[in-house]
Amino acid sequence: MSKIIGIDLGTTNSAVSVLEGGESQIITNPEGNRTTPSAVAFKNGEIQVGEVAKRQAVTNSDTVTSIKRHIGEDGYKVEANNKSYTPQEISAMILQHIKSFSEDYLGEEVEKAVITVPAYFNDSQRQATKDAGKIAGLEVERIVNEPTAAALAYGLDKTEQDEKILVFDLGGGTFDVSILELGDGVFDVLSTAGDNKLGGDDFDEKIIDYMVSEFKKENGIDLSKDKMALQRLKDAAEKAKKDLSGVSSTQISLPFITAGEDGPLHLEMNMTRAKFDELTSSLVDRTKEPVRQALKDADLSQSDIDQVILVGGSTRIPSVVESVRKETGKEPNKSVNPDEVVAMGAAIQAGVISGDVKDVVLLDVTPLSLGIETMGGVFTKLIDRNTTIPTSKSQVFSTAADNQPAVDIHVLQGERPMAADNKTLGRFQLTDIPAAPRGVPQIEVSFDIDKNGIVNVSAKDLGTQKRTKITIQSSSGLSDDEIDKMVKDAEANAEADEKRKEEVDLRNEVDTLLFTVDKTLSDLDGKVDEEEVKKAENARDELKAAVEADDIEDMKTKRDALNEIVQNLSVKMYEQASQEQQGDQAAQGSDDASNASGDDDVVDADFEEVDDDDNDNQ
């Protein structure tokens, strides 16, 4: 059965996801981006979709954007390329583009899809969306409400109690607020409100207007009349908006934006977040009324809402987040990428349809090995596959660097020797480890699985007794098919895995050797012949060069050579130390005979032991 993809067909941007190994994976477009502009351009008889179309939205009049606003609108057509196109046809071109690069990613033909729509879409809008899919060569298995898809991606279907969820969706071109009631895994849309003429594009326009106004004040030229300049302003405004979501100010620099009487002119401007908030405050205010309306329509108050989740890239704007916080009285859940969350939920719904997503029956044995990632990306098992539960296991680990203040515990499930090839169950950190050389702190990692298959993992510093833990429920884990696949993968890749593990072990061994050599050379300073030390330093540098060159065979050769030199140095140091002790003994007076006798017993024992070692070596 071919894969069913999940598509978020957005007003400004679209995204596509597929279920792989039980998790939604966003499929990147040919430009390597995780979202694709919902734009279509016609140029020289060619249809261009996505990034390339967006870049000519201002300069090419045959470019169509935000077609989703008109889908299902009776009689509406756009004129482009000397033809008339329905919204379904334009949407189909976007879907065809998505279908094409999804097939390239999956390496197989894609025939089926789940497509999301706003909760307020009526039947004709939903049917038009299905028709667009059909035109694109896709069988639309299901039309899913965007807020429901978002809630699925946030994992809210797995909550045990009934919940009321407010979904705040501010995309590039539209704004929606939906309130869902969730009970027994069923989503019910209680109310929906919004503004389909409000989105991130409007925030961009405010910045563009400000730049045009400021440039006109300084230079007397209206950039809005220049299409090429306007396209550059549009790109710069979008970048500034994104920058100001993370930093308090950003520099807008557009050299050679236009030309005046005295030659070329440049636009240089610093924009602060405070200025951005001032320019866009009216837009943020417009998001408040739909939130209040949705609550009123659902006959709910702020206190009735259990969770608020954010959808759409524009929800990254700090002033928007603050407004949501005030209007709902809740801290918004921002744990999933807002640009991708709807597509990811659509892929989960696709998995439900194909039977890949279902409740996992808790077994009385652990289906796969459990462990943690250790130095070099190795998967160290603590509990083996098919171990009867309940069970528990502990193992002591240490730090990988001097004065390491914390350790990251990466909990994994699977059968492959390398951590990256197994499934991540969770991560947590043990902090405040007292400063000490590497290898000294004792960190005890414990796995405990109870009869319900719930995994508790803890890490304890045996020195300070400080402890942290994480709880992982197996119902969010792997299906039987995934387990079979992982076991087969482990068998099929055994040889390659073993080679990679050997390489990691070699690197760890070399790293430890280099650390030991540096310490030994420091201890030997002035105690052995300088030429011998130089020889060791050269061998050490050669090994470092082999590591940098990533030459495994050369690393082995240089490692063995360095080991031999260091061992010889150590022997010479002990011989020298023994001779010095003998000299000290001979110089002692007879008055100290009784004391010397006691000391001689110790010295002789040490000396004889060294002699034995020398004889063995000879």
UniProtKB/Swiss-Prot annotation:
Q: Has keyword Repeat?
A: no
Residue numbers bearing the Phosphothreonine modification: 174
- Which key words are in the record? ATP-binding, Chaperone, Nucleotide-binding, Phosphoprotein, Stress response
Where composition is biased (Acidic residues), the residues are 598-618
Query: Where is the stretch described as Disordered?
Result: 573-618
Specify the signal sequence span.
none
Instruction: Specify the inducers.
Output: By stress conditions e.g. heat shock.
> Which residue ranges traverse the bilayer?
none
Could you tell me which Gene3D superfamilies the record lists for this protein?
Answer: 1.20.1270.10, 3.30.420.40, Actin, Chain A, domain 4, Substrate Binding Domain Of DNAk, Chain A, domain 1
**InterPro entries, from UniProt?**
ATPase_NBD, Chaperone_DnaK, Heat_shock_70_CS, HSP70_C_sf, HSP70_peptide-bd_sf, Hsp_70_fam
Family note:
Belongs to the heat shock protein 70 family.
Q: What does this protein do?
A: Acts as a chaperone.
Question: What is the recorded name of this protein?
Answer: Chaperone protein DnaK
**The species this protein was found in:** Tetragenococcus halophilus (Pediococcus halophilus)
